[in-house]
Amino acid sequence: MKRTLYLLAVMAFTLTAQAQKADYNLIIGTYTTPGNSEGIYVYDFNTNTAAFKANTVEKSVNPSFLSVDPSKRFVYAVNEDGVKSTVSAFSFDAAVGKLSFLNKQAAEGQDPCYLISDEKNVIVANYTSGSIAVFGKDASGALTAAKQVIQHTGSSIDTARQKSAHVHMVRFSPDRKHVIVNDLGEDKIYLYAYNRDAGDSILVVKDSVKIKPGSGPRHIVFSPNGKFAYLIQEMQGDLTVFSYTDGLLKKIQETDIVAKDFKGEIGSADIQISADGKFLYASNRGTANDITVFAIQKDGQLIKKSQSSTLGKGPRAFVIDPSGKWLLVGHQYTNDVVIFKRNQITGAITDTGKRIALGAPVCFVFVPKK
């Protein structure tokens, strides 16, 4: 009898622990202008079932991109607002899903669209002004004044969109010794050496790579093993594969996310890799509004597997949940998040019928409940 009770207790404890591991905070950044959202939203999300529940909201102007620091205690947001653009810092209580505003700093550029953070710094990509700003952090997680501002000055062939530099992304290299910077306006990727304690010279340019003229480099991701990088180009649907070694990129494949018979408007947006490194996903806005699935080969190259409608308009951002079971797509123009079931064997996605109704959802971050 005692043994039976003991086994039941162990089973109950195990099931409770598994349930807790499946409970996450889903933090969503939005556009508030134009739009009908208020700022940053936190949802409870269960990775076993894809069940969700609205929890809290923190008011903020156009927090279109978010970064959670390594401790999971602080969240940083861009506030995309033209010449009035700022960067905001929040503390985060993961146990209850609550953000608390700490402070903000001028973005040192116009329309920040991406940022990354570590224990020491927050690095921001300012799109319209074509600059990079590096901010420090104090012990409370608040932002200090900018330590370094780097201005790009180039251009490219598209006279409507590439008259000047437009920094679209900053990303740490896998070893965090470099920062990769995509400049849509220059058709160029910059590779900066990163020394987080170097005062006003935290970023020092090491190399740059020219991309196909008129293609517009947007987002880049690394394979889980850090050996390959994948660049999505916004303006023509191109997708470029690189090998990566110690701050240097070498091109090994050119492909695209556009269907052969597609004749509409292209607006490549987001790119993600499954945690097992087997599949790559890329979204296209414009008149396509779809996601293309690629299988990743051992040599890093891609094979196109399938293409699916995202069931909305403007799939600016999407995310694969921590379990790998679900893929969530945010629609900027139809104001919802569509939840797909992801086949972890084939990579294919299918609609679950689940929807989060939310104005212009454009960034997603998962943080475990504590």
Named regions from a protein language model:
Residues 43-50, 90-97, 135-144, 192-201, ...:
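Short loop/turn segments immediately following beta-strands, especially the blade-tip
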Residues 97-169:
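Asp-box/WD-like beta-propeller blade repeats and closely related beta-sheet repeat scaffolds
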